Amino acid sequence: MLILLEGADGSGKTTLCKQLKEFGFNVEPTVSRSETNQYEQWIKLINKGDAIIDRSFITDLVYRSVDDKKAGNITLEQMCYLLKYCKIILCDTDSAFEDSMKRGENNIVDKETATKIKDAYKLILTMLEKFTKAEVFTYNWKKQKFNEVIKFII
């Protein structure tokens, strides 16, 4: 099973990834968007066994829905297949944009874009839950305990 960590910049994905690694979970690097065949790379990760992944093909779908650029090379059919072997944790805080700015990150340039990304995540993950039966857990590290994440994974 792959555990996909998703969420806007500043939402706590990388911190959660580090905590899960310290807890003993296998953490794998995400598949590069520059890969010519991302689907094959995801299949290799699934075949490798349980792992935590910081961002996934869902990230590409969300960000492309906001900036109107072409999405990656994974088809909807392939995505539905991959999701059978994944659980998704959406890291979500009300202050993600501000937290990102405090750290000096500049991937998201304004609050309006950050809000669009947050809304796109919620919409896309709701649709994936409904139509593919994907398991999604929303985690706000400022309000919830780490053990809630562990319970979802296990």
What are these regions (language model features)?
Residues L2:
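Walker A (P-loop) ATP-phosphate-binding motif of ABC ATPase nucleotide-binding domains
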Residues L5:
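Hydrophobic anchor at the beta1->P-loop junction of P-loop NTPases
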Residues A8-S11, S56-T59, D94-F97, K142-Q144:
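Short, solvent-exposed loop/turn segments at secondary-structure junctions
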Residues A8-S11, T15-I52, T59-D67:
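Conserved substrate/cofactor phosphate-moiety recognition/catalytic segment
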Residues A51-D54, C91:
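Structural recognition of the conserved hydrophobic beta-strand(s) that form the central parallel beta-sheet
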Residues D67-L128:
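A glycine- and Lys/Arg-enriched "phosphate-lid" helix/loop adjacent to the NTP-binding pocket
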Residues C91-T93, I108-E112, K130-V149:
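Phosphate-binding beta-loop-alpha motif at adenosine-nucleotide cofactor sites
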